[in-house]
Amino acid sequence: MLNFLQSVQFAKEIEKKIIEYEQDIDISEATMLYEIAKHDFDLVKNLADTIKRYYFKNNIELCSIYPAKVGMCTEDCKFCSQSIYHSCKIEIKDVASVDEVIEYLENIIAFPVKRFSLVTSGGELNDSEFERIIDIISYISKNYDIHLCASLGFLTKERAKKLMLAGVTRYHNNLETSSTYFKNICSTHTQAQKIETLKIAKETGLEICSGGIISMGEDMIERIKLAFELRELKVDSVPINILNPIKGTPFEDMKIMDQNEIFITLALFRIVLPRKTILLAGGKENALKDMEKIAYKCGINGCMVGNYLTTQGMGIKEKVEMLESLGLEV
């Protein structure tokens, strides 16, 4: 274990490696930073914040999602309220109409939200559902000045091309957790299927967005491994969700990890992925409460605003005001 002066020197060397030499750290260095953070959290937090400010200044990117299809999912992800295998009380919704989506979109464009995504439940949409989503995306693309994303499950090359032509610039599919821990959260599909979808999207010319959910019983080594696996995929954006244990799911009694562990995780993701957009996404209000402000000093340069898929978030106006109070430029 390094003493304090050695820890300071190690952090300086990592900063120089990333900023001056533009080199990435390896997994042993990330693990060492975790060991340092257990005793000197501010040292690692400040390193992450310095790296974030070097590449992104005080800017923070806002995105918002719309649940364009809800429930009746035939996958068995243990964290999700939309699975048919679980007993959650949610409102089932077929694919939304253009009018329903536009009504929500009109509420968010008054704020500096850069990206807007349609998200659908299930492993993949049938052809009719997919074409309805294409119609919505095409309408928004032609009539609104906002970057469009989509999260529609598994993807084919043909569908990826259609999405890009309709106006989508970024495709989302979370790895959820590390490759070695994935078996603990889902059995109806593999992480390899998710990776194949991300590769198809990237090869088509779409940017890719992929992250995960922390606090599902994994340890920090698994989280660090996820960060490196995302780096290997050359993702453009990394949403980090914090489990919100929902009644009726297998994870309803899962204990939320310590807030300090959450902050360390965020900082390590920034240091491992220094030049990527890292968003604080679902579950942040429930897990962090009044301590959420600290997260934006841990290397975060993105924030999902508004509601989530089946749970409520903070009002966009309140969230923007909070971010601006921290000196962040939205």
From Swiss-Prot:
Pfam families: BATS, Radical_SAM. Disulfide bonds: none annotated. Residues 55-284 form the Radical SAM core domain. It catalyses: (4R,5S)-dethiobiotin + (sulfur carrier)-SH + 2 reduced [2Fe-2S]-[ferredoxin] + 2 S-adenosyl-L-methionine = (sulfur carrier)-H + biotin + 2 5'-deoxyadenosine + 2 L-methionine + 2 oxidized [2Fe-2S]-[ferredoxin]. InterPro entries: Aldolase_TIM, BATS_dom, Biotin_synth/BioAB, Biotin_synthase, Elp3/MiaA/NifB-like_rSAM, rSAM. One of its GO terms (molecular function) is 4 iron, 4 sulfur cluster binding. GO terms for biological process: biotin biosynthetic process. It is an enzyme of class 2 (transferase). Its cofactor is [4Fe-4S] cluster; [2Fe-2S] cluster. [2Fe-2S] cluster binds at residues 117, 149, 209. Pathway: Cofactor biosynthesis; biotin biosynthesis; biotin from 7,8-diaminononanoate: step 2/2. It comes from the Bacteria. Its EC number is 2.8.1.6. [4Fe-4S] cluster binds at residues 73, 77, 80. Keywords: 2Fe-2S, 4Fe-4S, Biotin biosynthesis, Iron, Iron-sulfur, Metal-binding, S-adenosyl-L-methionine, Transferase. Binds 1 [4Fe-4S] cluster. The cluster is coordinated with 3 cysteines and an exchangeable S-adenosyl-L-methionine. Belongs to the radical SAM superfamily. Biotin synthase family. HAMAP family: BioB. Homodimer. Catalyzes the conversion of dethiobiotin (DTB) to biotin by the insertion of a sulfur atom into dethiobiotin via a radical-based mechanism. PANTHER family: BIOTIN SYNTHASE (PTHR22976), BIOTIN SYNTHASE, MITOCHONDRIAL (PTHR22976:SF2). This is Biotin synthase. The lineage of its organism: Bacteria, Bacillati, Bacillota, Bacillota incertae sedis, Caldicellulosiruptorales.
